[in-house]
Amino acid sequence: MTNVTVTDNCKIAKFPAPEGDYRQIVLDYMKKMSQIKWTPKETFTITKKGPRSNVNLTYEKGKTYYGVTYSGTKCTLDQFEQLVHDGVFHNNGEYFDEVVGNHCSSSISTALQQLISNGGIGGTKPQKWYPGIFKFTNDIKIPYEYFGDDYSSFDIWDFNSKLKIFEGYSLLKSADILYYCKPGAGHVRMVYGDAEVVYDENGMIDGEKSTVSVIEQTNAWDKTVEVNTTWFVGRKYTFEKLYEKHFMPITLEFYSNGDVPKDAYVILDEKNSPSSIKGGLSGKITSTFPLNYAYATVKNSDGSIVRSSLKNNFTNVYELKLADMNSDLDLSSLAKGSYTYTLRVAIARGGADLESFDFVI
């Protein structure tokens, strides 16, 4: 549970470290993101056209959907919930890089950030520039001497046998990673349950019968279930199919290295007030974990939002000046009346209302 402490000069939100089985904590968060139920206020289509991927997903008014929308803004469950009111999603745009939502890697990154501050920024694979985060199962060889951190799945295949990769798949457990990458493209899945390994009569791994179940955020509707969702939950892939598509078996070092999660803190260094807000917001937010979003709203006496500013789609951002919201809020142009101002700030673990008060123009 998040606690907000108020001092003379600042406000501090504490996000306690989660307790329990680390793998289950991560997997449960992915499940929650895949299961949120909503219906769109109006029909909208998320689009993106480019060499890396094409997105064309229409969400229809009157239909029920499950899971955070597929988009490129790296949102957490908490951020998505801010736009869902009484089960209705009020979308904020129709472009892939505008609509609040997440995609394959950002969903996994926010899930891993339940435990650690770096959850895959820059790629969900072992890299020298941020060591100690990910590692391959089964001591799979990394050809750093030839490619540095820019190695692809194809390079890993060139330097490791098929048996080595299969043995790596066999070691996968819940909340591990399956990652395919090549220059300019890739896809990542989270392991949903421990690998199911079948051996043939010679004691070798049977790649056609051995499977790994996953949970993944995708750019397509799941046609195998009766609900509307882009989240594939519990889908099984054979070792052969994973190998054919060059998915690398990866685990988080945190699961086994003896480290423990740390409490996270978000600090607002200057308090706004009913008298000062008329001149605009001031102060700076700093965080010990990556910020996911900051959302300022102004509601009228009827409870309707008349001004808002959403700062999001962050990559490794740890501080934000509230003055950056003033152009969106345009508080000096508010008509005379009574209003309520709220500032919500969040990391992957969740959000907290750092400020909320009534004021009069």
Regions found by a protein language model. Name each.
Residues 277-289:
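Aromatic/hydrophobic beta-strand junction motif of beta-rich domains
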